[in-house]
């Protein structure tokens, strides 16, 4: 938790959040995610929450699924988390990991188009296995008020240049949005 407390500029409803780990909008999901990491090291849950790959222990949620049993193991881990936290958690694992697995599965096609991109996918997956980060997907431009035409939106809803200087450009707005609570 300390690692996400430092060096963050997080704003909620226009106000800077002083400590993301204590803010009522972020604390519940941060605490649950910390619990999931703790479960991976707890002797009671370790065999359910982790898997051995090439001699290394990895989070089962990040591990590439190759067999039906791999999928059942992921399901058991998810069920265990739900039982342990006593509720429904919308993000028990990385919601983007499935896309990474799909790209990994499609490497033969990707190699024909861009071998470096294909290699980057493999490198990224193995880095995720080793370091066990928690991705947050932010993969689309903000939608804004969908009842308004694009030209009628808040001008700062989308990323745009507001000033050019000899040193570069100044931008304002958002490039990506996420529905994640963290």
Question: Language-model features: where?
Answer:
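N-terminal-proximal low-complexity accessory segments that begin disordered
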Residues: 1-39
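Intrinsically disordered or highly flexible coil/loop and linker segments, enriched in small
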Residues: 6-10, 39-43, 130-134, 141
């Amino acid at each position: 938790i300390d690692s996400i407390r430092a060096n963050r500029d997080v704003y909620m409803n226009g106000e800077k959040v002083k400590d993301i780990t204590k803010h009522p909008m972020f604390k519940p999901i941060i605490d649950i995610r910390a619990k999931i990491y703790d479960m991976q090291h707890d002797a009671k849950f370790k065999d359910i929450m982790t898997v051995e790959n090439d001699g290394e222990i990895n989070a089962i949620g990040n591990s590439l699924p190759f067999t039906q049993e791999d999928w059942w193991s992921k399901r058991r881990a998810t069920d265990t988390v739900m039982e342990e936290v006593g509720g429904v958690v919308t993000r028990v694992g990385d919601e983007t990991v499935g896309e990474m697995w799909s790209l990994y599965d499609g490497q033969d096609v990707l190699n024909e188009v861009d071998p470096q991109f294909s290699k980057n996918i493999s490198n990224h997956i193995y880095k995720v296995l080793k370091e066990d980060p928690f991705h947050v997907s932010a993969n689309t431009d903000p939608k804004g008020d969908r009842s308004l035409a694009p030209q009628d939106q808040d001008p700062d809803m989308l990323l745009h240049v507001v000033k050019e200087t000899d040193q570069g450009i100044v931008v304002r707005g958002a490039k990506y949005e996420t529905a994640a609570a963290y």
